[in-house]
């Protein structure tokens, strides 16, 4: 017994010693760097080797320096082991989903691998059966648990199928787009009862109900007009001018108004107009409303180009407003039709109202256009053969135009967009030969460019304005990312969309100018966040200063383009982009003018006022915005100008420079260079401006030796006598024989009392001295 205890003690002692020996060894032999660094000669001599080729010792002895080859069994890195661990966990998780109750031990995995290697053609669905055969205990437990829950064979089979890993397809409902005989559409979402009934019909293999009987009234509702409605329609129809005038106004609309946004195809519109004019008994309220709005736009654009436009009653009495009022009166009848004409009418009315005093109502009509587009299913792609390829393309162009208006109105008003991008499944507009007008340039590439800019604008508003990051560094990262995407958009721009200032006669000159203005507006919207940071913190990085420079350059480019359009009579307040983008660039240029005041900025601001004055003379909204900008400009001017009405405050801001200036004058005896008026005058009281006046021009101060010019350069207004208000109370005289006064601190100058009391006391004393001397 004692021998066994002694053996155990010796063994425990040896184990403890071995453990201590392992702890003392700090670096394992296989990880020591010296193992492969020393050459064979240094190893044999047991001397230090520097690992060179050759080493210093071998080079000195002039012998061959040979190193032992490294072992190919490299030690696995820690990162690789961690990656293997993650891979193992992922594979175990995947296998557990396929075979939930399989025991993932090494011996079981080896067994199932051998079993699967015997039958390479075994399908995947049979793997679960093989695993159950290998693990009998698990299979028995599953059988007992299933019998405990339910003893029926069907439930046992369903449960075994679930355990086998067969994925059951989910139950889904699809949205539908019903098409009528006249290509009228009706959108039914996946939550509607019709979608549920259709799913039941498919599952029960029932015959589908005829859509002609089910949706005929909902697709093409028959509208019956009352006597009052018919009178409204007849009155609106009577306002249509002669055919020659109609053609002129229609061409003016499609050339000048419908540029980057699509409302109606010109060829189809003229064909529909001929049919409408030929049928006097039947009046289509939808097309009549669109026709009146097109004529109103054409008339207003023609009237805008006249130079003798009255600012007061431009929108009060003209033919365009009468046409617009007639279209607005029959618009409720258009809503009852619930077809594409409701979308087009709402869009045109909203565009027209933005240049009037009812600018806020225009956003409501834009919202109606969006809601009607969704109700008609314009945002969903349809495979129905009833819709021709041309009809699908026209619907796609109209929806994308509504989408762009929604995004840009969202940016202008600050509200969130109404159509989520995820809900739109239609493709981009494409060029179809049947829809192209011979001799005219296609606007499809312009539309695609504007659509991409609308998406980027929404991303800008979402990341920088609606959901801003609390950290400025994160905001700079967002600016960097968005700016990179804008540059990518610019590099991918089609050559026909690139704006050329010299190509004034190009058919898409105005459209390309608007695309460039939208791009510059996106740059301003992205980078003006950093411009606000500059007002708070002037120590910015070079990258942030570059972004501020880009902001100013974009605003400058917008005004130059707008002024170019104004010069060639292409600028219009009826254009959404031509109206809002110049006003968006105005605050940036005014801020740059008052902080930099360079000649280039002054020239651009001069063009800015010309553009805004033109828009304000033709638009009520622009007139109010211009007055607001003028007030902002006055505030900036008052902030940067010296406060001449408060000499104490002005003296506080420049007291230190003034002290150094007086000190330089006292040391250099500069008092003799000034003309002193007092005794040499007629003995009348003199103001400080008269008593202390330079004998020559103000520039002579710069030539005086020893004068501190920092004060002169920083405060140029102090050298101009006209900038100071004369004070009849403070009458001071300076004697030539007096020496310069010693410096006084600011507290000694003002004294412990109030500044106003001290100034009044000083004024009283000086007035008494003056009276005594004159008396």
UniProtKB/Swiss-Prot annotation:
GO biological process, one term: regulation of transcription by RNA polymerase II
SMART domains in the cross-refs: Fungal_trans (SM00906), GAL4 (SM00066)
Domain of life: Eukaryota
Presence of the UniProt keyword Protease in the record: no
Main localization, broad class: nucleus
Modified residues (Phosphoserine): 208
Alphabetized Pfam families for the sequence: Fungal_trans (PF04082), Zn_clus (PF00172)
Region Disordered: start-end pairs: 676-695, 754-775
Keyword Lyase: no
Gene3D superfamilies named among the record's database cross-references: Zn(2)-C6 fungal-type DNA-binding domain
PROSITE patterns: ZN2_CY6_FUNGAL_1, ZN2_CY6_FUNGAL_2
Keywords: Activator, DNA-binding, Metal-binding, Nucleus, Phosphoprotein, Transcription, Transcription regulation, Zinc
Cross-referenced SUPFAM superfamilies: Zn2/Cys6 DNA-binding domain
The entry's DNA-binding region: 39-65
Localization, UniProt: Nucleus
One GO location term (cellular component): nucleus
Molecular function via GO: DNA-binding transcription activator activity, RNA polymerase II-specific; DNA-binding transcription factor activity, RNA polymerase II-specific; RNA polymerase II cis-regulatory region sequence-specific DNA binding; sequence-specific DNA binding; zinc ion binding
Function as written in the Swiss-Prot or TrEMBL entry: Transcription factor that activates the nmt1 promoter. Regulation of thiamine repressible genes. Positively regulates conjugation during meiosis.
Entry protein name: Thiamine repressible genes regulatory protein thi1
């Amino acid at each position: 017994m004692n021998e066994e205890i002694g053996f155990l003690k010796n063994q425990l002692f040896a184990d403890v010693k071995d453990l201590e020996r392992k702890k003392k060894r700090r670096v394992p032999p296989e990880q020591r760097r010296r193992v492969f660094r020393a050459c064979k000669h240094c190893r044999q001599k047991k001397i230090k080797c520097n690992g060179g080729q050759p080493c210093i010792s071998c080079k000195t002895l002039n012998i061959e320096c040979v190193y032992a080859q490294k072992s190919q069994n490299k030690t696995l890195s820690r990162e690789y082991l961690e990656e293997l661990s993650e891979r193992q966990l992922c594979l175990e998780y995947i296998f557990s989903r396929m075979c939930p109750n399989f025991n993932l031990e090494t011996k079981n995995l080896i067994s199932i691998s051998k079993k699967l290697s015997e039958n390479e053609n075994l399908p995947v669905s049979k793997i679960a059966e093989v695993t159950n055969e290998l693990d009998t205990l698990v299979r028995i437990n599953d059988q007992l648990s299933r019998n405990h829950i339910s003893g029926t064979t069907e439930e046992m089979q369903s449960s075994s199928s679930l355990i086998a890993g067969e994925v059951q397809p989910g139950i889904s409902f699809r949205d539908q787009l019903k098409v009528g005989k006249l290509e009228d559409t009706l959108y039914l979402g996946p939550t509607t009862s019709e979608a549920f009934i259709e799913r039941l019909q498919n599952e029960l293999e029932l015959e589908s109900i005829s859509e002609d009987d089910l949706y005929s009234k909902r697709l093409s509702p028959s509208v019956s007009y009352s006597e009052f409605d018919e009178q409204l329609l007849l009155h609106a129809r009577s306002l249509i001018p002669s055919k020659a005038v109609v053609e002129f106004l229609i061409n003016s609309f499609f050339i000048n108004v419908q540029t980057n946004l699509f409302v109606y195809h010109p060829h189809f519109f003229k064909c529909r107009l001929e049919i409408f004019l030929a049928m006097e008994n039947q009046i289509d309220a939808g097309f009549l409303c669109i026709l009146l709005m097109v004529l109103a736009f054409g008339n207003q654009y023609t009237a805008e180009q006249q130079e003798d436009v009255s600012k007061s009653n431009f929108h009060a009495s003209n033919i365009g407003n009468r046409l617009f009022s007639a279209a607005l009166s029959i618009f409720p009848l258009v809503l009852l039709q619930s077809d594409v004409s409701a979308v087009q009418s709402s869009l045109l009315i909203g565009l027209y109202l933005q240049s009037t005093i009812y600018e806020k109502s225009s956003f409501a009509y834009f919202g109606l256009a969006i809601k009607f587009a969704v109700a008609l299913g314009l945002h969903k792609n349809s495979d129905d053969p009833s819709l021709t390829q041309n009809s699908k393309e026209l619907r796609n162009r109209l929806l994308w135009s509504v989408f762009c208006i929604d995004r840009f109105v969202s940016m202008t008003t600050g509200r969130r967009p109404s159509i989520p991008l995820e809900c739109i499944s239609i493709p981009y507009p494409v060029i179809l030969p049947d829809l192209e007008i011979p001799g005219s340039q296609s606007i499809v590439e312009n539309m695609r460019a504007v659509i991409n800019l609308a998406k980027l604008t929404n991303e800008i508003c979402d990341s920088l304005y609606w959901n801003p990051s609390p950290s400025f560094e994160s905001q700079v990262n967002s600016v960097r990312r968005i700016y990179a995407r804008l540059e990518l958009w610019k590099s991918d721009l089609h050559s026909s969309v690139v704006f050329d200032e010299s190509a004034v006669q190009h058919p898409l000159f105005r459209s390309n100018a608007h695309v460039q203005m939208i791009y510059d507006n996106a740059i301003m919207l992205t980078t003006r966040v950093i411009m606000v940071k500059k007002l708070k913190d002037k120590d910015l990085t070079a990258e942030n200063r570059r972004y501020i420079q880009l902001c100013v350059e974009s605003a400058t480019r917008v005004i130059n383009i707008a002024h170019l359009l104004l010069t060639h009579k292409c600028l219009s307040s009826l254009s959404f982009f031509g109206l809002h983008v110049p006003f968006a660039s105005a605050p940036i240029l005014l801020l740059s003018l008052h902080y930099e005041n360079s000649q280039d900025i002054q020239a651009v601001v001069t063009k800015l006022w010309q553009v805004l004055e033109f828009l304000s003379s033709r638009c009520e909204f622009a007139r109010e915005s211009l007055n607001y900008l003028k007030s902002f400009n006055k505030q900036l001017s008052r902030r940067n100008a010296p406060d001449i009405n408060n000499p104490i405050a002005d003296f506080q801001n420049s007291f230190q420079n003034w002290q150094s200036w007086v000190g330089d004058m006292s040391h250099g005896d500069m008092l003799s260079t000034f003309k002193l008026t007092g005794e040499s005058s007629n003995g009348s009281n003199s103001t400080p401006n008269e008593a202390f006046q330079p004998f020559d021009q103000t520039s002579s101060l710069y030539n005086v030796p020893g004068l501190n010019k920092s004060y002169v350069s920083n405060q140029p207004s102090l050298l101009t006598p006209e900038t100071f208000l004369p004070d009849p109370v403070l009458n001071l005289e300076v004697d030539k024989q007096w020496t310069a006064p010693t410096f006084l601190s600011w507290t000694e100058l003002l004294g412990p009392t109030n500044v106003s009391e001290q100034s009044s006391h000083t004024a009283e004393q000086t007035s008494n001295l003056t009276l005594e001397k004159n008396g």
